[in-house]
């Protein structure tokens, strides 16, 4: 599966315990997203388009309206990086 650099970066953040916070409009459509790391830092280059691509590929999931997190399929697709050791 082809995963862009921004998607890969977001998946690494999510794999290390990050979350994607989302806002909905009156029609229940997602209008804004923020990718937050485990430490509370915001991933600046994460856009709504990246979020929609990750969701379309089923690499992220949300259960019962909770923040989006990485799915099992996303964990299997993310490439290992030496500098992302979670500490």
Swiss-Prot record:
It comes from the Bacteria. InterPro entries: YjhX_toxin (IPR018654). Pfam families: YjhX_toxin. HAMAP family: UPF0386. Belongs to the UPF0386 family. This is UPF0386 protein RSKD131_0371. It comes from Cereibacter sphaeroides (strain KD131 / KCTC 12085).
């Amino acid at each position: 599966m082809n995963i862009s650099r921004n998607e890969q970066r977001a998946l690494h953040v999510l794999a290390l315990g990050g979350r994607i916070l989302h806002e909905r409009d009156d029609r229940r459509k997602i209008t804004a997203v923020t990718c937050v790391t485990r430490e509370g830092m915001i991933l600046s280059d994460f856009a709504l388009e990246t979020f929609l691509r990750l969701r379309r590929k089923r690499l992220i999931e949300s259960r019962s309206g909770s923040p989006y997190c990485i799915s099992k399929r996303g964990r299997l697709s993310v490439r290992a990086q030496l500098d992302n050791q979670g500490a």
